[in-house]
């Protein structure tokens, strides 16, 4: 397995072609499954719905997240996390960790290659699905249901959510040493803000007369958890401000991942 030219300076570029190809060979199947899942839950379901479901013939869609909303949300929150877990698995195996860190590459270069490969794995399926959906707007029956603007909004939102979940999973992977534990911690941390606010609201409603009930606080709670946000996107779409917040969070967690990676003791790999 040839990952670089012997003697190559590690300062030349963050991109290493050999490592990138190896990552795609190892983890490219995730991208293929992600693409097939998105095609099944959106283009195929829309074609079937137009032909068999009278509701879709009467009213245009509010947004594309209403199509198989629960299944679609599940796909969007599972595949990026799986990708993040797999591209950081080398840190949790002593042999793989030793192999990666014996390469003539700095840790920052290794992590940059992993993030780049992971980003392509989760983004390419979303972009291809967006392209398919854009072509479908040329169909007379389907163009009544949704427009190009709806497709691009879905594509941007799905891309941002996928990228954030990937980056956050990599960040957690820098802190823990087991893949299963990493996955559990990711979902717990993503739900934790909404759970804490809900518990605080229950406590305050019990002791403060006139404190607003959960129905008044529901929107704020839904915005606090990326997982809840995805599952409620069919009736509460993300705003452009929300997307900018996710971009900012991605930048923060990428920076923290690089910082933690530089300080991580590889000998702790199990």
Could you tell me what each predicted segment is?
Residues 2-6, 10-12, 48-66, 195-269:
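Terminal transmembrane helical anchor/hairpin motif
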Residues 76-82, 159-169, 245-258:
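Hydrophobic cores of alpha-helical transmembrane segments in multi-pass inner/ER membrane proteins
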Residues 62-66, 117-177, 186, 194-198, ...:
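Secretory targeting signals
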Residues 2-35:
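Aromatic- and glycine-rich beta-strand/loop motifs that create alpha-glucan
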Residues 67-96:
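Long, hydrophobic alpha-helical segments
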Residues 25-29, 33, 86, 108-129, ...:
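Alpha-helical transmembrane segments of multi-pass membrane proteins
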Residues 87-120, 269:
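Helix-loop-helix units of permease transmembrane domains in multi-pass membrane transporters
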Residues 26-53, 71-82, 186-196:
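Hydrophobic alpha-helical transmembrane segments of multi-pass membrane transport/permease proteins
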């Amino acid at each position: 397995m040839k990952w670089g030219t012997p003697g190559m300076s590690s300062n030349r570029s963050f991109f290493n072609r050999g490592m990138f190809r190896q990552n795609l060979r190892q983890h490219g199947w995730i991208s293929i499954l992600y693409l097939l899942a998105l095609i099944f839950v959106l283009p195929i379901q829309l074609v079937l719905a137009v032909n068999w479901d009278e509701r879709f013939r009467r009213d245009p869609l509010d947004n594309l997240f209403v199509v198989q909303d629960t299944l679609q949300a599940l796909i969007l929150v599972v595949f990026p996390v799986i990708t993040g877990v797999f591209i950081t698995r080398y840190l949790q195996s002593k042999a793989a960790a030793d192999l990666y860190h014996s390469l003539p590459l700095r840790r920052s270069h290794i992590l940059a290659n992993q993030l780049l490969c992971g980003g392509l794995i989760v983004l390419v399926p979303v972009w291809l699905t967006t392209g398919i959906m854009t072509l479908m707007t040329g169909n007379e029956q389907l163009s009544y249901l949704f427009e190009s603007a709806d497709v691009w909004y879905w594509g941007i939102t799905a891309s941002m959510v996928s990228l954030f979940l990937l980056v956050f999973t990599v960040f957690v992977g820098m802190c823990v040493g087991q893949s299963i534990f990493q996955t559990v911690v990711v979902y717990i941390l993503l739900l934790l803000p909404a759970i804490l606010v809900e518990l605080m609201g229950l406590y305050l409603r019990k002791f403060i007369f006139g404190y607003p009930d959960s129905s008044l606080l529901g929107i704020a709670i839904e915005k606090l958890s990326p997982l809840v946000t995805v599952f409620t996107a069919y009736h509460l779409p993300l705003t452009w401000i929300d997307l900018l917040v996710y971009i900012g969070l991605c930048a923060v967690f990428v920076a923290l991942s690089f910082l933690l990676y530089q300080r991580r003791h590889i000998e702790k790999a199990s």
